[in-house]
Design a protein with these regions (language model features):
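Conserved mixed alpha/beta catalytic, RNA-binding, or beta-rich assembly cores of soluble enzyme
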Residues: 198, 266-267, 317, 323-325, ...
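Right-handed parallel beta-helix
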Residues: 184-186, 191, 205-216, 229-239, ...
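N-terminal domain-start segments of secreted/luminal proteins
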Residues: 34, 149-185, 193
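Extracellular beta-strand-rich solenoid/capping regions of secreted or surface-exposed proteins
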Residues: 123-127, 172-186, 194-210, 216-231, ...
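A structural detector for beta-sheet-dominated domains
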Residues: 51-53, 86-88, 96-98, 117, ...
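Bacterial Sec-dependent N-terminal signal peptides
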Residues: 1-28, 210
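Beta-strand-enriched, solvent-exposed domains that form extended recognition/catalytic surfaces
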Residues: 28-159
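Short, recurring structural edge motifs at helix starts
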Residues: 172-176, 220, 263-266, 292-296, ...
Length: 343
C-alpha cells in the first residue's frame, strides 16, 4: 500500500510537471505598447500598426527622430521616425507610408532576412523575435522608420520604494536639465515617459537606469557614466551613452540616435569590464569607441565587449579603437570583443 501511494504521488508530480511545462510552452502571446505624451514631437510620415496573430490592430506613436545626412561635405539634419513596442510570441506589423506609393522597401539589418509584402503604400511583415529594425521606403535611408521591439519587462520597480526614482508616462523636467543619480538608486522611465534632461551617473556605485522611456532627442549626451562602478542600463532611448573611468558596466538594449556634431554613440574611456548587449547605435560620429586617457579620464581599457548589436554611422566609424591616450606613458587596450555585430 505504501509503495502504491508513493507511485501515485510520483505520477501526480510528473503529470503536474508536464502540464506545467505545457503551460509555459503554450503561454499566451503578449503585446505592450505606449502612447507618446502630449507635446512630444511626432512624425506623420508613417502609420505603424501591430497586432498579435489575427488580433486587434494597435496604432503606435511615431516619434520624430533627427539624423545627420552628409551631402557634398556639408551636414543636413533630416527628420526620421521611431516607434517602440514589446512582445512575446508572434506579431504582425503594418507600416503605411503616408507620402506616396511604396515602390521598393527594405527591412534592415538584412542579415535577419525578414520577409515582407508590399501592398500599395503599406509594408507588412511578421516578427517572432524582438528586433531593432530600420524600415526604408523607396531607397530613402534618412527619412526611415526606426522600429525598436523588445521583450516585456520582467520586473517593474515599485514607485513607492524610496530607492527608486520613478518617472511614469508623460513629459518630465529636472532641475538644471540634469538628473544626478545617487549610489544605490534605480531610475525607472516607464513606457510613454519622456525625460527633458541628462542622466548623470557620476562618482557613484550600484546604480540602475531602466525602462522603456525616452531621454528627449533634444538632449545632447543623454546618458553619462563617469568614475562609477556596478552600473546597469537597459531599454532606454537616448542620443548618447558614454562611459569613462568606470568598471562593471552593463548597457543592454539601449538605443542611441544622434544628429549633431561630435555625436558619438557609446564611447568608452579608460574603463574596465564594460558590456554592450543588444544595443542600436545610429550616430553623427563614431558609434562606439574604446580610448585610453581622454577628456579627464586616465588609464587603459580592459574587457570591453559589444555583442548582438547594430551600428550605423552616418558620420565617421561604426567601431573606432585607439587614437586617444597618453603618448608619454602609453596605455594598454586589451580583451576587446565584438560579437555578432550588424553594420
Amino acid at each position: 500500500i505504501l509503495f502504491g501511494n508513493i507511485m501515485k504521488k510520483y505520477w501526480f508530480l510528473l503529470l503536474a510537471a508536464l502540464l506545467g511545462g505545457a503551460t509555459c510552452i503554450f503561454a499566451k502571446d503578449t503585446l505592450a505598447t505606449w502612447k507618446a505624451p502630449a507635446g512630444v514631437a511626432l512624425n506623420s510620415d508613417f502609420t505603424v500598426k501591430v497586432r498579435l496573430q489575427d488580433g486587434v490592430w494597435h496604432t503606435l506613436s511615431s516619434y520624430l527622430i533627427k539624423v545627420d545626412e552628409v551631402r557634398d561635405t556639408r551636414h543636413y539634419v533630416e527628420n526620421a521616425s521611431m516607434a517602440i513596442f514589446d512582445f512575446t510570441g508572434k506579431v504582425e506589423v503594418a507600416v503605411t507610408y503616408n507620402l506616396g506609393e511604396v515602390q521598393t522597401a527594405k527591412v534592415r539589418p538584412l542579415s535577419y532576412d525578414i520577409p515582407f509584402q508590399i501592398d500599395g503604400n503599406t509594408v507588412t511583415f511578421t516578427l517572432e523575435h524582438p528586433r531593432n529594425l530600420s524600415v526604408e521606403v523607396n531607397g530613402d535611408i534618412f527619412h526611415n522608420l526606426h522600429l525598436f521591439t523588445g521583450s516585456p519587462e520582467r520586473t517593474i520597480p515599485d514607485k513607492d520604494n524610496p530607492e527608486v526614482i520613478y518617472f511614469g508616462p508623460g513629459i518630465h523636467t529636472v532641475k538644471n536639465g540634469e538628473l544626478r543619480v545617487p549610489s544605490g538608486k534605480t531610475v525607472y522611465l516607464a513606457g510613454g515617459a519622456v525625460l527633458m534632461g541628462r542622466v548623470l551617473i557620476e562618482n557613484v556605485h550600484d546604480v540602475k537606469l531602466l525602462g522603456r522611456g525616452i531621454i528627449d532627442h533634444s538632449i545632447k549626451g543623454g546618458i553619462r557614466i563617469a568614475n562609477s562602478r556596478d552600473v546597469y542600463v537597459e531599454g532606454i532611448v537616448a542620443t548618447q551613452c558614454a562611459t569613462g573611468g568606470s568598471e562593471n558596466v552593463t548597457i543592454r538594449n539601449v538605443k542611441s540616435i544622434s544628429y549633431y556634431g561630435w555625436g558619438d554613440g557609446m564611447n568608452v574611456f579608460a574603463s574596465n569590464n564594460v558590456l554592450f548587449d543588444g544595443v542600436f547605435c545610429r550616430n553623427s560620429d563614431d558609434c562606439t569607441t574604446v580610448y585610453g586617457t581622454r577628456l579627464g579620464f586616465e588609464g587603459g581599457c580592459r574587457n570591453i565587449t559589444m555583442q548582438n548589436s547594430t551600428l550605423w554611422a552616418d558620420v565617421a566609424h561604426p567601431i573606432f579603437i585607439g587614437i586617444h591616450g597618453n603618448s608619454k606613458a602609453p596605455e594598454v587596450l586589451e580583451d576587446l570583443n565584438y560579437i555578432n555585430i550588424d553594420i
